[in-house]
Amino acid sequence: MPVSLLDTTLGMAVRMSTPYLFAALGGLLAQRSGVYNFALEGMMLGGAYFGYFFTLLTGNLLLGILGAVIFGLLSGWLLAFISIRFGVSQMVVGLGMNTLFMGLTSFCSRLLSNSRDGSALNLDRLIGNIISGPAAEIPVIGSVLCSQNLMTYLIIALFVFYAWFTRRTEYGLALRAVGENPAASQTAGINVFRYRYLSVIISGALAALGGAYLTLTQVSRFSENMTNGRGWIAIAAICLGRWSPAGTFFSCLLFGLASAASNQIQVLNIGIPYQFALMVPYILAILALVSIQGKSSHGPAALGKPYMKNR
Amino acid sequence: MHNQKLKAFLRKRSFLITGGMALIAILLAMLVGGVLIMLIGIDPILAYRYFFYGAFGNIYGFGETINKFTPLLCCALGFSIAQKSGFFNLGGEGQFYAGALCAALAAANMGSASPIVGIALPVLAGIVGGAVLSSIAGALKILFNANELLSTMMLNYIMQYLIALLVSGALKNPNSSMEQTVPIPDPVRLPALMEGSRLHAGFFIALAALLLVWFLHQRTVLGFEMRLSGMNPKSARYAGVNERRSLIIVILVSGALAGLGGALELQGNQYKLMSGFSNNFGFDGIGIAVMGQYTPAGIFLSTLLFAALRVGTGSMQRGVGVPTPILYILQGVIIISVIVSNYFVRRIKDSLVEGRDA
Amino acid sequence: MKKKSFFAVTMSITLLLTLLAGCSDPGAGSGGGPSGGDSAGQTGGEASRLKVAWICDGVLTDGGWNTNGYEGMQKLAEEYDLEVSYQENVPQTDVGDVLRNYASEGYDMVLSNEQYHCEPMVEVAADFPNVTFGCVNAYVSAENMIAFSGTLWQHNYLAGVMSGMVTKSNKLGLITFSTDSDSALTYLSSFRAGAQSVNPDIEVVHVATGSFSDLAAGKEMATSLIDQGCDVVYCNSGDCNATVMELCIERGVYTISAIVDRNGMSDEYVLGSTVNLPSTQLRMMVEGKLSGTHTGNVTPIVGGIEDGIEAFLVNESLQDKLDASVFEAIDEATAEIIAGNVTVELP
C-alpha cells in the first residue's frame, strides 16, 4: 500500500537521524568539557559490531546493548586517557582510533563468519517499534513520532536531560566552566580531570549506542564499515547546532532529512544523477558551516586545548 | 660519570629518542597484530616473514612498495605543511582526486606537445587542481571561519561522488565497459626508471617536493612566518606577520602537494582515472605525517613504512591467508602509540635539559 | 628513565634487525615463490600440486558474490588437492600489480572473481604465457586466459517476467550499487524487458545505494520504493541484498534474491533467485586446466540459462500460492530465450 511521500520522508528522516543524535550528543558532551572526540565514527562502528555480536552470542537484545555500552565506555576511556593524561593532539588520537576500530571490527567479523555458516549470522529479533496500530496510521505524527523504536525515544529523553543538566545543575555548570577555562575552574576547586574523563567516557558509550542502533533496530547483521561516515556528520551537526543541545538536536534531524531526501530524489526519478543525490548531506554540511559564520557561539573556549596539571 | 655522558650523547642526538620511540610503536603494533594473527590460527612468525618478503624481499614487491611511496609522500607533505601552520587539512583524499582529475583533463589534450611540455603541463594542472579544492575549504575558513576539519572532510565525499559521476558519464572511455577514462597518451606518461620494476620518475619529483618543502619551511622568510603563525598566532601578529597571507599560501601549497600526488599517480602508474583511484592515500598521509613528526627525514621513513604496510599485508594474505583488515589495525596502533610516545619524548628531552642545568 | 629508554632503543633496533633478517624468502629452499617449499606451513606436499591464486574486489564476507567464489575455491582445493592462495579487496587500481605478483611467484593459475578485472588481466596474461589466467564473467580474453561469462540478462529477464505477472501496482523497484554503470544498466534493461513482455504498462524504478556495506541506507532505499507503491523489490548491492529482502518480507511485498539462492528466506514473498554463481565458472576453469582440455579462449564463452552458467530459480513453495499462469509465462519465456527469440537491448 503506497504511503504518502511526506510520511515516508519524515519517518525515514527520524530513523536516519537517530544514529546522528546519539553520536552528536556524545560528541557534544565531550566538547563541552573541552575535549574533541574525533573517534565518533570508529566508536559507532565498534558499537554496531559489539552490540550485534553480544546479541548473537546471548540471544538477548539487552545484553547486546550492554555489550555496545561497555565497548563504548572502554573506547571512551582510551580516548580520555590518551588525550587528557598525555595532552597530545586530540585530532590525531581520534583518527588513529577510527582506523584501529575499523580494522578491529572487520577482523572480528571475519573471525565470526569463519566460525559460523552464513544463515547463523542473522539476529532473530530486532528492537521493534513500541507503538503500533491506529496511532501509527495518523498522518505525519504517526510516521514521525509513533513508528519509531525505543532507542529513538531514549535519545530524545537524553537530549532533554542533557539540556537540563548543563543549564540547571551545579555539576552541569561546572562542566561548562571546565570547557571554557580549565585553569580557573581548577582554582575554584573543580576537578577538571574528573569532569573531562567522565564526559569523554560517556561520550564513547553514546556513540557506541548510535552504532548499535543500526545493527539492533535497523538491520540484523553487521557489515564492514557500515557506519559510512555517520560519525563525521554528527560532528558537523554539533558545529551547526552551535554547541547547544536544541541546535544540535535539530541539526541532526536536518541531516537525517537530507539523507532521506537523497533517497527520495532517486525514487521520484526526476533525472538527477544518483551521485548528486548522494552528495546532498555533505553539501548541506558545508552550507551549514558557512551559515554559522559570525554567530556568537564558537564552542567552548578551551576546546581542543590540552590542560595539564601544573607539575 | 657514565650517566652524564649518556645524557650528553642523547642531547646531541635527540633523533635517537624519537626514532627509538617510533620503533617501539612499530613493535607494539606488530605485537598486537601478531596476537590477532595467532587467534585465527596462523603462525605469526611465518605471517611476518611473508610481510617482509612481500614488501622488501623481492623485486616485484619492492617495486610495489616504491609505487605506493610516491602518492603517499605527496599526501603526507600536504597534510604536514598545513598542520604546522595550524590548518588541519583532512581533505588530502579529495585534493588527490582533484589533482588527478585536472591532470587527466590536461593529459587528454597533450597528444602533439613535446615530451617535456606534455609531461609537465598535466603535472602543473594537477598541482593547480589540488590547490583549487583546498582553497574552497580555505576560503570558507578565512571568510566564514568555518571549521576546516569538517569542510575538508565533506569535500572528500563530494569529490568522490563527482569522480564517480564523471568517469561513468562525460569522461567515460567509450571503448571499455569499465567506468574509467581513456588511458592518457604515451608521451604524457612519466618514464619508468628501472627494468623489471614499476619505479617511475614521479618518485624523484616527490622527493624534490620533499626537499622543496623543507627548504621553504626552514630557509625562507615565508617559511618562518608559516611556522610562527602555527606555533603562536599572537606573537606572529606582534612580529608583523601577515597571518592571513601566510595562511592562504599554506592552504594552497597543502592542496597543491596532494594534487601533485594525484597527477604523479595518474601519469606514472595508473594512466587512467576511475572511482577508487585513490586507495585511501589522502588519509594515510595524515598517519604518515604524525608518525614522521613532521620532519623531512621522519616523513620519508614513515612513508616507506606505510607503503610497506600496504604491500606487506597483501603478501600476508596471499601467503598464509591473514585477512586484510589487519592493515588498519597495524596502522591504528602505530598512529596511537606514536602520538602517545610524543609525550614521553618530551619528558625525556625535558629531563635531559634539566640534567644539563644541574 | 633515560637508562630504560636507551635500553628500549637498543632492544628495538636489535629486534628490528632480527625481523629484517626474516626478509628472506619464507618459503626458501626450492627457490620458487614464498610458498614454494615445505617450510611454508600450510603448503607442503608434492611438486605436482596445482598452485591456484584467486582474487576478488571487495570483502570475502559479502554474503553473496565473493563469499560464493571463496567457498567454491575452498571446495575445489579440497576436492583436487590444490594449493590455493587468495587476496581480497583488490581495487581496480591494484589489479595489475596483484596479478603480476602471483604470476611471478610461480602460480599455475591466476583467477579473478571480478568481471572488471578482465581488462588488466589480458594485459598481464601477455607477459606470462606459461600461466593460465581466468576471470569470471569476462568480456575480453587472451590465449592463456579462460573466460566464461553469463549472458548477464537471461536470468534477470525471467525474474522480470515473474515480477510482471505478480505485480498489482505495475511498479517494480530495482536497487543496484550505481545506476549508470554498464552492469547496472544491463540489470535494468533485462529486468524491465522481461516485465514489460508480459505487461507493457510496467514501470521499473531504478535507484542506487552508492555503497555495498551501508545496510541501513540500503534498507531505507527499499522503504522508499515500497512506500511509493513498488510491490516487487529486487536488490543487487553487496551486503544490502539480504537486508532488503528481510524488509520486503516484513512489509509483505515480493522480492527476488540476486546472485545466490535465498529462496528459503520466505515461502511467501521470495519469488525466486537469479543465480549466476562465480563458483560454477571457477570450477569449469580449474577442471579445464587440470584435465588439460581447456587452458584458454581468446573470445569469452558466453553461456546462458541453457548452459547452467546462470539460472532463475523459482521459489518452489509458491507453486500452490500463485496462479498457474505465472509459471506458464516463465516456462514460455524460458523456451523463447533458449530458442533465441528474445533479444534485449543492452548498453
Sequence positions of predicted segments:
Chain C
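C-terminal motif of bacterial Sec signal peptides marking the signal peptidase cleavage site
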Residues: T18-G22
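A residue-level marker of the well-folded mature domains of exported/periplasmic proteins
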Residues: C23-P347
